[in-house]
C-alpha cells in the first residue's frame, strides 16, 4: 500500500464486458444499428471509502467532498443486501455495516440488461463508482463491480480507507493552517515533545490491546475508560496509526481491535 497518493489505489481498467459473475462495465445506452469502438474507461485516483463517509459527504455533481476535499471516483467493499433488475439497470444495495446500505446502480442498454444476471444477495463485492444525488438521496453510479474471491481484500480495503482519509485530513490541514514565524530551536523542541507524546499514547494503546484476552479484542470504549486522561481524538488517532502500520486490526466491527503480534 503506497502512501504517495491516491493514484496507487486506482489506475485499473474497467473495459471488460458485463456478465453476472465477473467484472462488469456500465453502459447507459445501447447502439442498435452501428457498433463503434468505445474508448476504455479508466478508473484513476480512486479513493477507498466506507458507506458512512459517502452518505455524509457533500455533493457537487459530478464530484463530492469528503472532509472538505473534492474527490471524484471512490471504491467501497460490502455485502449485497438486495439486487433488483429494472428496464435498463440493476440496483444493488451494498452494506458495509458503517451506516445504512447504499444503492449502487449499474446501467446497461435495454437489450443487454435482459441478458445479465444480477450478482447474488449475500456475497461480498468491491464496487468502483461515482457518487450521485439526483433526487436528494445519495447513491453510487457503478463503474465496475466484482465479487471478492479473497476476504483479505476486505481487510486491505479497510487499511487503505484509513490511510487515504488520514492523507485527506493532512491535505486539509496543510491548506488551512497559517504559517507563523518561529525560531529553529522552537520548532525542534515542539516537534520533539509532540513526537514523544504521540509515541507514548501509541505505546499505551498498543499495550492495552495486546494484553486484552477477549476474542473480539479491545473496544474503544474500554480504552477510553482505562486512558481517561487522554482525549477520544488522541486515542482514535493512535488506533488509526497502529492500524495503518499493521500493529492492530479491527475484528467484529470498527470499535474492537486485536494485536497483530
From Swiss-Prot:
Region (Disordered): 175-194
Cellular component GO terms held in the UniProt record: chromosome, telomeric region; DNA replication factor A complex; nucleoplasm; nucleus; site of double-strand break
CDD domains: RPA2_DBD_D (cd04478)
Keyword annotations of the record: DNA damage, DNA repair, DNA-binding, Nucleus
GO biological process: DNA damage checkpoint signaling; DNA repair; DNA replication; DNA replication initiation; double-strand break repair via homologous recombination; nucleotide-excision repair
UniProt feature, compositional bias: Low complexity: 177-187
DNA-binding residues: 74-148
Keyword DNA repair in annotation: yes
GO molecular function per UniProt: single-stranded DNA binding; telomeric DNA binding
InterPro entries referenced in this protein's UniProt entry, alphabetically: NA-bd_OB-fold, RFA2-like, Rfa2/RPA32, RPA_C, WH-like_DNA-bd_sf, WH_DNA-bd_sf
Keyword DNA damage found: yes
Expressing tissues: Preferentially expressed in placental and colon mucosa. Widely expressed at intermediate or lower levels.
Subunit annotation: Component of the aRPA, the alternative replication protein A complex, a trimeric complex similar to the replication protein A complex/RPA but where RPA1 and RPA3 are associated with RPA4 instead of RPA2. Interacts with RPA1 and RPA3.
Family, per entry: Belongs to the replication factor A protein 2 family.
Protein name: Replication protein A 30 kDa subunit
Gene assigned in the entry: RPA4
Amino acid at each position: 500500500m503506497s502512501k504517495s497518493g491516491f493514484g496507487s489505489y486506482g489506475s485499473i481498467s474497467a473495459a471488460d464486458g458485463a456478465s453476472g459473475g465477473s467484472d462488469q462495465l456500465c453502459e447507459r445506452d445501447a447502439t442498435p444499428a452501428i457498433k463503434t469502438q468505445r474508448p476504455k474507461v479508466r478508473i484513476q485516483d480512486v479513493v477507498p471509502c466506507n458507506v458512512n463517509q459517502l452518505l455524509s459527504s457533500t455533493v457537487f455533481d459530478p464530484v463530492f467532498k469528503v472532509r472538505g476535499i473534492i474527490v471524484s471516483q471512490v471504491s467501497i467493499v460490502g455485502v449485497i443486501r438486495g439486487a433488483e433488475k429494472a428496464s435498463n439497470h440493476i440496483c444493488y444495495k451494498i452494506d458495509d455495516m458503517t451506516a445504512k446500505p447504499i444503492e449502487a446502480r449499474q446501467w446497461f442498454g435495454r437489450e443487454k440488461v435482459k441478458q445479465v444476471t444480477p450478482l447474488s444477495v449475500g456475497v461480498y463485492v468491491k464496487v468502483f463508482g461515482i457518487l450521485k444525488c439526483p433526487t436528494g438521496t445519495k447513491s453510487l453510479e457503478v463503474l465496475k463491480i466484482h465479487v471478492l474471491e479473497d476476504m483479505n481484500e476486505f481487510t486491505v480495503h479497510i487499511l487503505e480507507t484509513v490511510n487515504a482519509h488520514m492523507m485527506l485530513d493532512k491535505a486539509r490541514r496543510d491548506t488551512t493552517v497559517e504559517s507563523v514565524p518561529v525560531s529553529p530551536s522552537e520548532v525542534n523542541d515542539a516537534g520533539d515533545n509532540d513526537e514523544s507524546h504521540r509515541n507514548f499514547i501509541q505505546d499505551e494503546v498498543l499495550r492495552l490491546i495486546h494484553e486484552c484476552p477477549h476474542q473480539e479484542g479491545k473496544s474503544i470504549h474500554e480504552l477510553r475508560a482505562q486512558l481517561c486522561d487522554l482525549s477520544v481524538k488522541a486515542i482514535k488517532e493512535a488506533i488509526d496509526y497502529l492500524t495503518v502500520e499493521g500493529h492492530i486490526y479491527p475484528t467484529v466491527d470498527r470499535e474492537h481491535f486485536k494485536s497483530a503480534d
